Amino acid sequence: MEVDLLHFEKKYHNCIVAGIDEAGRGPLAGPVVASAVIVDNANIITGIKDSKKLSKKKRELLYEQITSNYVWATAIISHTEIDDINILEATKKACSIAVANLSLEPEIVLVDGNMQFKDERFVSIINGDNLSLSIAAASIVAKVTRDRLMLDLSAEFPQYLWHKNSGYGTKEHIEAINIHGLSPYHRRSFRCC
């Protein structure tokens, strides 16, 4: 049975609805990125789904379409702030900033996962990136934005292979940390080796 990715957007059809998702909660290095997207229900881009289910090439193509056709905003919280306030609080902060940065103020904000926010507009949806077009679009924008940042950082620190692992704790990444030590972009609060 195919899922109606506009189910939640239709449920709040009289409201401006934003979807929000993050990329980078689990990596050992780099920032956490949250993106918010307001989908234009009269201009549905085909192929949008959870970023993890798309090839890099398809994500890049959809990123260009989403950012050219929909209202969107992104927020980036650095690795140092993650260490200062913890990854959960950093993620929530990035989500709140991304929503605040939208050029339209949403009345409802659909959030992937089970994070709780004080702002009553925020509605958490477990597995939301598979159930909401807005959240799926946000997952693509967040993932592509973060991957591009990690690609830039990889040019400065190629030994960690961030162009391949995006800062996640792959075997090769951990081996590089054991050989070269931590870079300035590694999260000190994440125990990795």
Curated annotation (Swiss-Prot):
GO CC term, one of those recorded = cytoplasm
Spell out the subcellular localization from the entry.
Cytoplasm
| Catalytic reaction(s) noted | Endonucleolytic cleavage to 5'-phosphomonoester
GO terms under biological process: DNA replication, removal of RNA primer; mismatch repair
For this UniProt record, give its keywords in alphabetical order, as a comma-separated list: Cytoplasm, Endonuclease, Hydrolase, Manganese, Metal-binding, Nuclease
Task: List GO molecular-function terms, semicolon-separated.
Answer: manganese ion binding; RNA binding; RNA-DNA hybrid ribonuclease activity
For activity, the cofactor(s) needed are: Mn(2+); Mg(2+)
Q: What positions does the domain RNase H type-2 occupy?
A: 15-193
Pfam families for this protein: RNase_HII
Q: What is its main location?
A: cytoplasm
Q: Which domain of life is it from?
A: Bacteria
Cofactor note text: Manganese or magnesium. Binds 1 divalent metal ion per monomer in the absence of substrate. May bind a second metal ion after substrate binding.
Residues that bind a divalent metal cation: D21, E22, D112
Matching PROSITE patterns: RNASE_H_2
Entries under InterPro entries matching the protein: RNase_HII (IPR022898), RNase_HII/HIII (IPR001352), RNase_HII/HIII_dom (IPR024567), RNaseH-like_sf (IPR012337), RNaseH_sf (IPR036397)
Which Enzyme Commission numbers does its entry carry?
3.1.26.4
The record's listing under Gene3D superfamilies reads: Ribonuclease H-like superfamily/Ribonuclease H (3.30.420.10)
HAMAP family hit by this protein = RNase_HII_B
User: What NCBIfam families would the database entry show?
Assistant: PRK00015.1-3
In the record, the note on similarity to other proteins reads: Belongs to the RNase HII family.
**What is the role of the protein in this entry?**
Endonuclease that specifically degrades the RNA of RNA-DNA hybrids.
Q: What is this protein called?
A: Ribonuclease HII
Species this chain originates from: Rickettsia conorii (strain ATCC VR-613 / Malish 7)
